[in-house]
Amino acid sequence: MKRIKGGLIVSCQALSTEPLCDPYIMSMMAYAAKEGGAVGIRANTTVDIEAIKKKVDLPIIGIIKKDYEGSDVYITPTEKEVEELVRTGVDIIAVDATKRMRPGNIIFEEFFKNIRSKYPNQLFMADTSCFEEGKKALELGCDLLGTTMCGYTEYTKGHSLPALDLIERYSKELRARVVAEGGIWVPEQLEAAYKSGAYTAVVGTVITRPRDITRRFVNALKTLDE
């Protein structure tokens, strides 16, 4: 935990629909991030995590993104994904900690009590969207609270990002270790997250997703023609 405090964690992920979806490419992204001074990596899928572990000696936050019919939860949604991540030896496992129903009509509280009991020594990060969720996750034994899902649930859509107000409340009211994640596009926003009380921070798209970055610039050009 001390290794990631006060530093930058870089999210190195590419979905199956993206050109850079390849474990080797993600491992090189992680290597480049380390060269740039990153203190940790957030990665998706066991194959990417294993490839990254061979390339860099940095703490890794691991997730498995998987869609299940009938549920909007897709970040490490079931115990099956948790078990797969535990087998990789990943340092921290991040799970969706929103109040949305999980696959099999399971609520977060039931899900997390089970995995906390099975893996008492594993560090877990709660990907939350609002204060209520963070408070519950901390009470249940989550080690880190992330603002990852703020703005992405139906009840938080339109929330300004990065979620500085949520970071501040988690830090001051709950005394939690807060992972600022989501909506950090420029260094000034990263600074603001830390001033709001972040323990550490994750930045992804603006560093490791060239297709999305390119689209952002192209869309800016389109407004010139309007």
Model-predicted regions and their roles:
Residues 19-23, 42-61, 72-78, 97-115, ...:
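Active-site-adjacent beta->alpha loops and helix N-cap segments on the catalytic face
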Residues 6-12, 41, 60-64, 93-95, ...:
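Hydrophobic faces of well-ordered beta-strands that scaffold small-molecule active sites
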Residues 1-87, 118, 124, 132-140, ...:
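Conserved N-terminal beta1-alpha1 strand-loop-helix module at the mouth
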Residues 57-58, 106, 119-122, 175-176, ...:
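Short acidic, glycine/proline-enriched helix-loop-strand junctions
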Residues 13-15, 64-68, 88-102, 144-157, ...:
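Glycine-rich phosphate-binding active-site loops on the catalytic face of alpha/beta enzymes
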Residues 166-180:
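Short, positively charged, low-complexity/disordered linker segments
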